[in-house]
């Protein structure tokens, strides 16, 4: 049994996808990009991003949990760089973690990003690239920037597969 729903067609790095449209609140519909498990798309897009970032001063790739993790991983592998994931929940093993609050466009709720204490040492004094799947309001990037600043890292580039909305 198949369901019928509206989609928005996209093509990125030679790969075509139909993104399902969702109403996130009255009057606002967005096309949802979910790259989790889509290895063909992730590989193509990450290779294209890695090529665009190749001449940038980058020591570490940084992303926020969760949907952009495969992208950050694949970009980091292609560029032979380490990567760091900012978590959305605190775990005791994270030690003296840094935190920053952002607002999620998909849930409309505040969310907190955490930088594990062990990753602070990895990024301190380094040039970092912030990588996300989609930039909508920019609030996640703002939270990521704040954490990088507090950790002593320098954001040299920001990259995403898509931007959407007026503030992206």
Named regions from a protein language model:
Residues 1-58:
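Active-site-facing substrate-recognition patch
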Residues 2-10, 142-168:
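PRPP-dependent phosphoribosyltransferase catalytic core
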Residues 58-65:
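Short glycine-rich phosphate-binding loop at a beta-alpha junction
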Residues 59, 126, 156:
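Conserved acidic residues
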Residues 69, 138, 142:
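Glycine-rich SAM-binding Motif I of class I
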Residues 70-79, 145:
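Short Gly/Thr/Asp-enriched flexible loops that form oxyanion-binding sites at enzyme active sites
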Residues 81-128:
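Short, glycine/charge-rich flexible loops or terminal/linker lids adjacent to PRPP-binding catalytic cores
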Residues 134:
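C-terminal binding/interaction regions
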């Amino acid at each position: 049994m198949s369901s019928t729903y509206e989609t928005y067609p996209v093509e990125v790095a030679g790969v075509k996808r139909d993104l399902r449209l969702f109403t996130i609140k009255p009057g606002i519909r967005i096309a949802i990009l979910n790259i989790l498990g889509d290895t063909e798309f992730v590989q193509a897009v990450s290779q294209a991003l890695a090529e665009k970032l190749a001449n940038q001063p980058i020591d570490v790739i940084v992303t926020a949990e969760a949907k952009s993790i495969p992208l950050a991983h694949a970009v980091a592998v292609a560029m032979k760089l380490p990567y760091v994931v900012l978590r959305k929940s605190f775990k005791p093993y994270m030690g003296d973690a840094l935190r920053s609050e952002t607002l999620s466009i998909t849930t409309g709720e505040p969310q907190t990003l955490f930088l594990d204490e062990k990753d602070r040492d990895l990024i301190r004094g380094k040039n970092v690239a912030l990588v996300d799947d989609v930039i909508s309001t920019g609030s996640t990037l703002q939270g990521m920037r704040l954490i990088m600043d507090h950790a002593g890292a320098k954001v040299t580039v920001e990259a995403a597969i898509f931007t959407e909305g007026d503030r992206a």
